[in-house]
Amino acid sequence: MKLELTPRQRKILWATVRSYIATAEPVGSKTLAQSYNFGVSTATIRNDLATLEQVGLLFQPHTSAGRVPSDFGYRVYVNDLLTSANSGGIPHDAPQPDPHPALQQLMDQLGRELGDDLDSLLQRVAQLLAHLSGCIALITPPQGPVVAIHHVQLVSVAPGRVMVLVVTDSYQTHSALVSPPDWPSDSREDLEDELQLLSNFLTLKLRGKTFAELQDLSWLKLDEEFRTYGHWLQQLLRSVVQRCLQPSLGQVFSAGMAELMRQPEFSQARQVQAVMQLIEEGAKQLQGMIGLHFADGGDPQLAYLPPLPSSTEMDQESGQSARKTPVIIYIGSENPLESLHHCTVIASTYHRRSAPLGTVTLLGPTRMAYERSIAAVQAVASHLTRALA
């Protein structure tokens, strides 16, 4: 059934949603009449509220209370928010989202410090994102077969122990401890020189290859000077794959549980426990759900792809249009995970060469500041995409 609302009813829906987001209190006709200039009586507003309730956009938690948005009401609000079709019916006197100067500052820092410690920086981004939104922030680092090797370095750290450091082209650093090879007798005194020679050789041979490709490399045909190391190199690569590739697959940087617990919707221990269990045990399931949606196209009504920018919004470096990052928004019962039916999930992916590298996610109550949250998720994903290009 097609939803048909009058312009005033749509304005009243918007005002109700925004008032409830701001106060967490049921909204009545008197509050709306005092806060917004609809140009009609409270009785007319009350009738429109009743109509919005009849079509499932609002409901009354108690008989004598005002109205609060349903999941469907939030969905209509968000769809209107993200399209220009209803811009004429939007109450512009409603509260507008505040800018995020702190987030912008950290994103600028991301571009400057990317090569230093990406994991630490992503954790700080998650913490700031959680603080600004009042939600839980989840960020997965670059991972998967599209992450390629950029540099390999072998370092002697103790007698009989060598550390192999692998730097990827997404600026992550992985390490593994291995036993040194059976050095030729004339090379034992020049251990550092020999390790540097092997480091240069490995960097030359492995640069641009993915971790998944390491398992299939053959070291049977090597230059004369490295032939004696063939078996050791095979073992070294096996250690790198086991130690460096596998742990990153489920890694999630998270922050914001304290912020979430301040929300009135999570005042009950049962609701907090469900989310804590998800973060501790099921974060990979949530991230997999998001990644699968983007990979398969997902439900069109859940996704948002902003329109192409005008010529003034071109990327200054590449000269190409900087289309905003698509987002996926699950509201309440839309969530595939039943434990999140009282939550909203806003997520996006960041990419390199059109291949998804990781996800940026906010998890909070359905009573969420959608404008700010969507803008923040898009900003982080877009900056990561540009920084890792």
UniProtKB/Swiss-Prot annotation:
GO terms for biological process: negative regulation of DNA-templated transcription. Pfam families: HrcA, HTH_DeoR. The keyword Transport does not apply. Belongs to the HrcA family. This is Heat-inducible transcription repressor HrcA. Signal peptide: none annotated. One of its GO terms (molecular function) is DNA binding. Negative regulator of class I heat shock genes (grpE-dnaK-dnaJ and groELS operons). Prevents heat-shock induction of these operons. Keywords: Repressor, Stress response, Transcription, Transcription regulation. PANTHER family: HEAT-INDUCIBLE TRANSCRIPTION REPRESSOR HRCA. The gene is hrcA. The keyword Repressor applies. It comes from the Bacteria. It comes from Synechococcus sp. (strain JA-2-3B'a(2-13)).
